[in-house]
């Protein structure tokens, strides 16, 4: 049993491969490069191909399947970069990673606090030795209503951690759960939109919820609403977000993800023209905090993501059920 790791980061992920290889009895090979037509052959002799979010085409899957690859363990919670229908046709099985929810949850709360207290502007002005107070007054989160869309592991952790701040909490999910009810009131989306000062997204990306935050949704929100997204970039229509920021309907945004980020994030683009017009525009707003999909990035989470690949392949190869497998 052998896994080919593509886009394996030598400065963090690689250190965890050897111990988990021994623990699960699975060999591995790796490259720091993302999959391309020129390096697909690296997967010859492997039973699994593991990737981070990057460009994966149906043709890549066909080539790997012809080499005998059966498993596609993603080293990320999201798996929307994998052509799922093609994988199903080829009989290839997909899994995603798991890691403790606190890292992303606390990062989302950090973005809320930074936006409320205008930390981005304060730091930029401090870099220019502007230590005046004018324009830096923040808002107190304890007097605000926060809406959490998606109450899975991360969304519930956001609610639990926010409950100590004293703010009012509302939640929306297609499948409400009792743990979240300890901290928040479940409401419909329209009620959440019109009631909340801060809205934070914690739901998976699906075809059904693509651009769920569009012009119509934004029009229903409170004036000056703060939007936080540490989930998936496709949840927000970037054009509607830009229009909302320009009009002042959206008071601020904290974004760790954006649409069409694959191939852009996790690479050094210093000196390059940014190949994402919406992101280039969003970065120009002083009331937007942008980070390049790093909410997950802790030592605990990186170890968990690498282990998830080994653990899922071991279970699927042995015919065991695993919650990490994606049901196609």
PLM regions and their residue ranges:
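Rossmann-like dinucleotide/phosphate-binding beta-alpha-beta segment
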Residues: 136-223
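N-terminal glycine-/charge-rich "phosphate-binding" loop or analogous flexible N-terminal tail
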Residues: 1-46
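A short helix->loop->beta-strand "cap" motif at the edges of active sites that frequently abuts
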Residues: 66-71, 90-92, 167, 223-225, ...
